[in-house]
């Protein structure tokens, strides 16, 4: 009886909000039939309260639907209910009650349910434009629809939630382009965006003004790059010439022209990323909307000049007016506003990408002029070429001829910063030995003008020192004969290279202080430079250092001998030549000329502190405690640990340890206060009194006896004052 008295709209709302999907599906099908049958007659129509009940049931029908595909299907079915209503007046009331329901229920939607209602708003707005399209975009129908949006959503008096209002502004032009992009004219489009012009002029919410400017007017400016060059006057002349067929033909031509322009814009890449996204969206949805930019600028200027327009709104509208005026004149939209920072950022990124593509073909001279910025790829190539030189060129390279003795200091100074060839000036005997083969042509060592990175200086300095320490046996024997001449030349060169030698000693502090203490190789085969078939001395091939086993003699160029002496930080950066042997300057030859061995071998690192025996400090004096009969301990450890009471001795008779059986007549049980009733385990035993209650013989009931003083003072522990 209760269900029979309820209205049909209430019953529909209950069944639409059911937790069972079958009940909801049947309710939606019956609602579709009910709306069609109720609005067929002219007299039969819905009231606002009845449609609010139906929309509330549809809202919760969408709420309980969880699967995404089923949500999209249900949103399509709900939005299609507008076309089931036969009365035009009931259709707009159906749309109005939808927006009222969304405003009322929006605050209770959580994040998980938000996307489905965004989709429902978009689809209902699209079907609302479909209603206008079926009515041939009549001006009266457009006015009625825009009044509903202005009253329920955009107006400040509507108190619509910001989420509903913002989402409507975001999807308005997109859905309008999807439905009427091929049919709407510039005047109709200007009328459809007129509510946003009014709300941008009179609202006091700065966020809403920015949202309208970005979501509506900035989109129109951005899509201007995708609109073909067809004037509004031509469209008007086509419309005035004849009726609908000419308009349809013009629309078809416009669609084809717009698609071609879109393809050209996207292919040439002349537009920004934001415009590209808008053009791609418009290409998928159809042809873009046509706007008369001069009419839009005039409308915005009119509302901006109103006295009731706030200053912030007027300033924002004036920037939009300048953009539309520039579009009307044929120029691109200026990028002076703060909203165009994103486009500037994208243009900078495109410019950087183009520069990086062109950077691969830049000449070396341009690299030097750019302030020392070298490309990463070229750095890697230079690094590989530094450690892995060409084998063919090294085989053909020979030691160059030595100039006169007058030019020796100059050549030494030029070769020192170069770092390409680590060859120093030879001795007088070495010059004579090379002069014997001067009749044969010797190829000149090529000098590369590549700039070296600063972090390679340690490596090159260490190579020069290592190569100077390994000398041929023949030169060492000859050096003893002409020691006087070599000492004079060494003194001349050492004065110019004194500063560099000090720096090398600082960097390689692990090497011995005096170079004379280093041993000289005394093998059977001399380690002289490699001689070719023609008698030309060639440089050996550079190889990377490899780990070697420890030997009895110390090789200055062997990295394994210097391993315990070189710090960890320098071991990572220094890579030495293992087989390369070059000639050295006379100063270094004289310093290394002696055949003495090292006085002290290099020691491995010991512990910082090492204690062989345990150290126990001895006290300065010892004072015996008063009234103590204990003897003085013998050792110092006994003085610190033992006290007079520590002389007691306790013994345990383990042979008398026996386990006793439990007996009820045990004397320990008889001594207990409960007597025979106390057993080992009695499950039926209960406590005599509670926790908060006291026994009859409580200490409070017994009289206090006078405190007795002890006859003798107890023996106390010694204090610190007893020892001093």
Curated annotation (Swiss-Prot):
Citrullinated by PADI4. One of its GO terms (biological process) is mRNA processing. The lineage of its organism: Eukaryota, Metazoa, Chordata, Craniata, Vertebrata. It comes from the Eukaryota. Its main location: nucleus. It is found in: Nucleus, Nucleolus; Nucleus, Nucleoplasm; Chromosome. Keywords: Acetylation, Activator, Apoptosis, Chromosome, Citrullination, mRNA processing, mRNA splicing, Nucleus, Phosphoprotein, Transcription, Transcription regulation. The modification N6-acetyllysine is found at residue 618. Residues 483-496, 694-706 have a biased composition (Low complexity). The modification Phosphoserine is found at residues 336, 370, 432, 438, 494, 668, 672, 698, 701. InterPro entries: RRP1 (IPR010301). Belongs to the RRP1 family. It comes from Mus musculus (Mouse). This is Ribosomal RNA processing protein 1 homolog B. Signal peptide: none annotated.
């Amino acid at each position: 009886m209760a269900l029979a008295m309820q209205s049909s709209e209430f019953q529909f709302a209950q069944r639409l909000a059911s937790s069972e999907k079958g009940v909801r599906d049947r309710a939606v099908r019956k609602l579709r039939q009910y709306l069609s049958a109720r609005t067929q007659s002219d007299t039969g129509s819905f009231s606002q309260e009845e449609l609010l009940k139906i929309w509330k049931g549809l809202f919760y029908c969408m709420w309980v639907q969880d699967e995404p595909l089923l949500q999209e299907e249900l949103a399509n079915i709900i939005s299609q209910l507008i076309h089931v209503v036969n009365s035009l007046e009931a259709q707009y009331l159906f749309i109005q009650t939808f927006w009222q329901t969304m405003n009322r229920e929006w605050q209770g939607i959580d994040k998980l349910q938000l996307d489905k209602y965004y989709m429902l708003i978009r689809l209902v707005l699209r079907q609302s434009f479909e209603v206008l399209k079926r009515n041939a975009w009549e001006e009266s129908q457009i006015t009625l629809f825009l009044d509903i949006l202005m009253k329920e959503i955009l107006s400040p008096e509507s108190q619509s939630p910001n989420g509903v209002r913002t989402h409507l502004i975001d999807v308005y032009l997109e859905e309008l382009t999807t439905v009427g992009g091929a049919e709407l004219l510039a005047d109709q489009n200007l009328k459809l965006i007129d509510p946003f012009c009014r709300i941008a002029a009179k609202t006091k919410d700065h966020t809403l003004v920015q949202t309208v400017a970005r979501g509506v007017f900035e989109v129109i400016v951005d899509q201007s790059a995708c609109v073909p060059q067809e004037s509004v006057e031509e469209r008007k002349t086509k419309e005035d010439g004849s009726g609908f067929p000419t308009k349809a033909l013009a629309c078809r031509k416009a669609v084809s022209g717009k698609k071609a322009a879109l393809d050209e814009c996207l292919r040439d890449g002349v537009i920004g990323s934001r415009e590209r996204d808008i053009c791609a969206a418009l290409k998928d949805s159809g042809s873009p909307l046509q706007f008369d930019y001069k009419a839009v600028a005039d409308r915005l200027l009119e509302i901006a000049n109103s006295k009731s327009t706030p200053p912030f709104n007027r300033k924002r509208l004036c920037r939009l007016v300048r953009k539309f005026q520039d579009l009307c004149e044929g120029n691109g939209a200026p990028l002076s506003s703060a909203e165009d920072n994103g486009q500037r950022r994208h243009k900078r990124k495109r410019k950087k990408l183009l520069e990086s593509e062109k950077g691969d073909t830049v000449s070396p001279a341009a690299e030097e002029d750019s302030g020392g910025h070298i490309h990463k790829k070229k750095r890697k190539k230079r690094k590989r070429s530094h450690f892995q030189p060409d084998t063919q060129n090294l085989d053909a390279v020979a030691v160059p001829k030595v100039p006169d003795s007058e030019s020796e200091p100059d050549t030494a100074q030029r070769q020192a910063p170069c770092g390409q060839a680590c060859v120093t000036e030879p001795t007088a005997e070495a010059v004579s030995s090379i002069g014997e083969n001067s009749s044969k042509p010797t190829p000149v060592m090529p000098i590369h003008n590549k700039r070296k990175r600063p972090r390679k200086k340690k490596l090159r300095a260490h190579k020069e020192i290592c190569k100077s320490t390994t000398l041929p046996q023949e030169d060492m024997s000859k050096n003893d004969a002409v020691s006087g001449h070599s000492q004079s030349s060494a003194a001349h060169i050492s004065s110019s290279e004194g500063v560099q030698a000090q720096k090398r000693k600082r960097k390689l502090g692990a090497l011995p202080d005096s170079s004379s203490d280093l041993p000289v190789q005394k093998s059977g085969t001399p380690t002289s430079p490699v001689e070719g078939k023609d008698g030309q001395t060639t440089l050996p091939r550079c190889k990377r250092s490899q780990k070697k086993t420890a030997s009895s003699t110390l090789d200055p160029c062997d990295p394994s001998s210097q391993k315990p002496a070189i710090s960890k930080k320098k071991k990572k950066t220094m890579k030495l030549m293992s087989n390369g042997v070059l000639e050295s300057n006379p100063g270094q030859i004289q310093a290394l000329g002696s055949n003495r061995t090292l006085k002290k071998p290099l020691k491995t690192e010991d512990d910082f502190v090492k204690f062989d025996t345990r150290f126990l400090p001895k006290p300065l004096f010892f004072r015996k405690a008063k009234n103590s009969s204990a003897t003085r301990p013998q050792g110092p450890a006994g003085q610190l640990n033992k006290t007079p009471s520590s002389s007691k001795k306790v013994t345990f008779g383990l042979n008398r340890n026996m386990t006793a059986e439990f007996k009820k007549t045990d004397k320990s049980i008889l001594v207990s206060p409960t007597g025979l009733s106390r057993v080992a385990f009695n499950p039926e035993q209960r406590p005599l009194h509670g926790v908060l209650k006291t026994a009859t013989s409580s200490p409070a009931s017994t009289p206090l006896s006078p405190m007795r003083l002890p006859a003798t003072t107890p023996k106390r522990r010694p204090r610190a004052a007893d020892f001093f």
